[in-house]
Amino acid sequence: MTGHEDRVWSVAWSPNGFVLASCGGDKTIRIWGKEGDKWICKTILEDGHQRTIRSLGWSPCGTFLASASFDATTCIWDQKSGEFECNATLEGHENEVKSVDWSVSGSLLATCGRDKSVWIWEVQEDDEYECASVIHSHTQDVKKVVWHPTKEILASCSYDDTIKLYKEDEDDWSCCDTLEGHESTVWSISFDGSGDRIVSCSDDKTVRIWKSYPPGNQEGVVVSGKHTKWKCVCVLSGYHDRTIYDVHWSKVSGLIATASGDDCIRIFKEDTNSDRNQPSFQLVATQRKAHSMDVNSICWHPKDENILATCSDDGTVKLWRFTPAEE
């Protein structure tokens, strides 16, 4: 799917999977929909941002689309009228905003940026957004924010090689755990469907699986204090030749997909009898030359377990159908 006039940074499916949004260096958002057997660009959203649009996030209801930009703002687009309109611009970051994500309830929005901060916004009535907290836990550029699939717990990853988790404690948000293990920038993170595990990918060319251990857990992992402790339980290395820019854990199939600077996309499957405390994964598919340049973003379809969207520095958006091998 072509149309963007510069690199495409991010793709995001609407919650029902009927629509795909993409954004990039041309300062536009494209909304793609299916007509017959073909996907076509239905709408181009312009005039919201002055610089590159880096990230997109749909609200759980599918009515709102948030866009994060290098112009230091986040725009909220709504389609209540049937057409997308920018109804709010969130300002506060000092420079590039790198990522945006809505909480499962739709009542909170998180953003992060090059200014090393994570912002949490409360969605008010009448399309107003109020900053609830600004968190300075990372020591470098924050690459991505992702909400837990069922709880109001936020995760972020950074150029400082760490992943951090946050929760609200007595009316203020604070960091409740720091996950260390990657040896270079952590580019992306994704929760599994239960929210008990996180997958991360890095400039160190590895994928890591982290598992949560609450206080009093059955496994006997010592947890000091009241907060859940996360531990790295698996490292997938040797599969990627260059930086891994994005990773997505399918909430439908449980498959993990990666997007890399070696122009490939890869799919990993957990072994059938895998021990959750020491899980094992197999590489089940590699699409070489998926794009002619870096693959920046990868996203499983929210309903159809075999469909994936990707985008790249080559200016294209692609849809893939993954056919699992017969067991």
UniProtKB/Swiss-Prot annotation:
Q: Which GO terms describe its cellular component?
A: cytosolic [4Fe-4S] assembly targeting complex
Task: Answer whether the UniProt record assigns the keyword Repeat to this protein.
Answer: yes
Cited Gene3D superfamilies: YVTN repeat-like/Quinoprotein amine dehydrogenase
WD repeats mapped onto the chain: 3-42, 48-87, 92-131, 137-176, 181-220, 239-278, 290-327
Signal peptide bounds: none
| Name this polypeptide is given | Probable cytosolic iron-sulfur protein assembly protein CIAO1 homolog
Q: Which UniProt keywords apply?
A: Repeat, WD repeat
General function of this protein: Essential component of the cytosolic iron-sulfur (Fe/S) protein assembly machinery. Required for the maturation of extramitochondrial Fe/S proteins.
